[in-house]
Amino acid sequence: MYLLYLDESGNPDDPSDRHFVLGGAAVFERQTHFLQQALDQVQARHFPRSQPVEFHASPIRSGRGFWRSVPEATRTAVLQDLVAAVTSVPEPGIALFAAAIEKSPSRWGEPAVQVATEELCRRFDILLQRRFHERSDPQRGLLVLAEGRFHQRARVWVEGFRRLGTQWGLLRNLADIPYFASTRDSRLLQVADLVAHATFLLYERRDAGLMRGLLPRFDRKDGVLHGLVHVTDADRRTCECPSCFSRRQPGQSGPWL
């Protein structure tokens, strides 16, 4: 079984944010323990005498809360160590996913979250289908989402996708309704937070500092980034983001990186 851990970045209701991102990591069940250990080792390396430290990328970058007294050089090293921990998981034990939703008059607030959820459910299902067809490896999937304002609605959406299908068709490989947890209680949801924040920085600010290390682990097939989706009203034939660019030139990530 693969467990897809998801968290969000950006405020879907805030007009100052042009994008809303839902992102995370699909982790093979036997790798979850080792990935959690890798994050625990990041804490042991930098804060060996502390109580469990919650890794949230945005406060780490900006120096908020616990991170206010931590030197910037240490905070930067922590983020890079977190990226290294995620990318250390051997393939096919992990695949990253993110949906960057460019907000519009009809696609903001709850609709933006619903579009992102539908996109990632579909792409996760495609990954599981591909593993079966290409490797004769029948795996089921389970979603674990960070608790938030829309998490109860997300349960309804995903159940609807399972029973009635998405706009692209039925989801055939999800084992159950989604489950929800606090990021404080789950290192794997902290990984999802890192992926979502890295994607938000790339699309909102053209800051590729975190995404550059994570992008190689996004789900892809024949050079096309299927794990990263850009939902926009602009012409995707000229968009130079990694998602759109790889569809025109497979194997290439484009100038943003």
Segments the model singles out, each with a brief description of its role:
Residues 1-257:
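Phosphate-ester processing/binding pockets and catalytic centers
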